[in-house]
Amino acid sequence: SGSCSLKTCWLQLADFRKVGNALKEKYDSATAMKLNGRGKLVQVNSRFNTPTTLDLVYVDQSPDYCVRNESTGSLGTQGRLCNKTSEGMDGCALMCCGRGYDQFKTVRTERCHCKF
């Protein structure tokens, strides 16, 4: 009698958060490139390491999303409400792009429909 072993391999996407974090890290460390006289891509700043095939590169600068720009559809961040204590995307430090922000307190009175 003979024995047989069976192996099954498959590809599976990584956790969405991990993929997003990896892409953001690559975006933040992308290398600026330009076309030289021969039409070949070369680094704008040669002090940095040459990008590998796994790195992101770019030719055009990303728009400044802090400033309103109708051609890109960006509404900017001026006048938006931010969360002073948050370190996330809704936090004032990130959303206000270093321009500072106004602070205010609001007192609201609401009926609570409490029963005693």
From Swiss-Prot:
What parts of the sequence cross the membrane? none
- InterPro entries listed in its UniProt record: Wnt (IPR005817), Wnt_C (IPR043158)
Task: Could you list this entry's UniProt keywords, alphabetically sorted.
Answer: Developmental protein, Disulfide bond, Extracellular matrix, Glycoprotein, Lipoprotein, Secreted, Wnt signaling pathway
- Coiled-coil annotation reads none
Q: What Gene Ontology terms for biological process does this UniProt record contain?
A: canonical Wnt signaling pathway; cell fate commitment; neuron differentiation
Enumerate the glycosylated residues.
N69, N83
The molecular function GO annotations come to: cytokine activity; frizzled binding
User: What biological function has been recorded for the protein in this entry?
Assistant: Ligand for members of the frizzled family of seven transmembrane receptors. Can activate or inhibit canonical Wnt signaling, depending on receptor context. Required during embryogenesis for extension of the primary anterior-posterior axis.
Q: What is this protein called in UniProt?
A: Protein Wnt-5a
Q: Which organism is it from?
A: Alopias vulpinus
